[in-house]
Amino acid sequence: MTDPTTEIDVDLDVQEILLAASQHDIPKLRQLIRSNQTIANPVNVKDPETGYAPLHAAIAACEPDDEEPNGVQTNGEQGDEQKSVEEKGSATVRFLLQEGAIWNDLDNNNETPGCVARRLGLTELYEQLVDAGVRAELLLNRLDGYEELEDDDEEEEEGQEEQTGTEEVEVEGESAPQLVEATTTTETAMETGPDVTNSRYLDSNLTFQNDRLLDQDQNGVMMAWETDIMAKSAKKLLPTSGLRVLNVGHGMGIVDGFIQEQSPAEHHIIEAHPEVVAEMKRKGWGEKPGVTIHEGRWQDILPDLVGQGVMFDAIYYDTFAESYGDFREFFSEQVIGLLEQEGKWSFFNGMGADRQISYDVYQKVAEMDLMDAGFDVEWEEIALPKLDNEWDGVRRAYWQIESYRLPLCKYMD
């Protein structure tokens, strides 16, 4: 039988760490974290009631007071005091991250430390967590690359084991790799279905409805609420008629419809799902002006187009259930052989759109990787309507933030 005294001691250890974090007492935190012998991972302990980790506690303690106790609005001295609190909070956050705190750990309210900072209006602390997320994701992406190189030299069975270990980076819905690994009970219930992988999607039966395209697991492949985004993307890419354009991923055909309105000279469409291809043919896409349909995955089709010397003035990328690594390969290895020097390209920017901090992190990650590949990117902020009622009958709400950032990429000068 477990000694209840031991349980109390463990709880006291946890509460002592959380208290030191909320008091921004770095010397005490250092002593508690580095000398603790009873907790396996003291920098990431959790409060059983709130789910707060030390990062949450350090940030929540910076919540500003709007009024004095007597109800009088203040600014001067309290403003200085608040600044001092936030500076101490920032130093504590920095220390905890250096000690191995998980930047995107979830509390019982389904909030990461960055979510708490954003909700409380703590901009500098929020940006600090965004930067921590960027560093973590860049490192993970690089490590994924190293694992791929190692897999090439291993036996097939070992390679399969490695693949099993990295399946979590596959995209769910329209978003990029899931950035929040910890889950609440609600999230776990939502994610009990099969993993969303590109191979499973391509083998699945699809449901075509007026306002959505669903796979057999009720994942939203494309939805009508994206229409305004697609219209603006097409006009950004094709400001004049007579241009040559490539779209990777037809889906419901929303963006291709707007591309047609711009009267392109050539309109190439790559579509990998056989049921979508059949629907395209049923709707007569193959007979539309300038349209060429390429059936298959872009990984198989684009090298042939490059070999044929086919070039485009505009490219759009919107695939389903591919990883960020696939996307990076697309713009790092393929676009350069297909896009004219003065051409532009864009993509559906759904990376990390399940929460604002994830979206902000992946915007910065993408910017850095695009720069490494030789591209400049501009972003246009587009306000979105409330989408709460859009997800009825859909397994996972792949968009949970208030606005969309439309990317427009071109070669660096």
From Swiss-Prot:
Residues 192-413 form the RMT2 domain. It comes from the Eukaryota. GO terms for molecular function: protein arginine N5-methyltransferase activity. Residues 65-85, 148-178 are annotated as: Disordered. It is found in: Cytoplasm; Nucleus. InterPro entries: Ankyrin_rpt-contain_sf, Arginine_N-MeTrfase_2, RMT2/GAMT_Mtase, RMT2_dom, SAM-dependent_MTases_sf. Keywords: Cytoplasm, Methyltransferase, Nucleus, S-adenosyl-L-methionine, Transferase. S-adenosyl-L-methionine binds at residues 201, 230, 250-255, 271-273, 298-299, 318. GO terms for cellular component: cytoplasm; nucleus. GO terms for biological process: methylation. CDD domains: AdoMet_MTases. Its EC number is 2.1.1.-. Residues 148-173 have a biased composition (Acidic residues). Its main location: cytoplasm. Belongs to the class I-like SAM-binding methyltransferase superfamily. RMT2 methyltransferase family. Monomer. PANTHER family: GUANIDINOACETATE N-METHYLTRANSFERASE. S-adenosyl-L-methionine-dependent protein-arginine N-methyltransferase that methylates the delta-nitrogen atom of arginine residues to form N5-methylarginine (type IV) in target proteins. Monomethylates ribosomal protein L12. This is Protein arginine N-methyltransferase 2. It comes from Aspergillus oryzae (strain ATCC 42149 / RIB 40) (Yellow koji mold). The lineage of its organism: Eukaryota, Fungi, Dikarya, Ascomycota, Pezizomycotina.
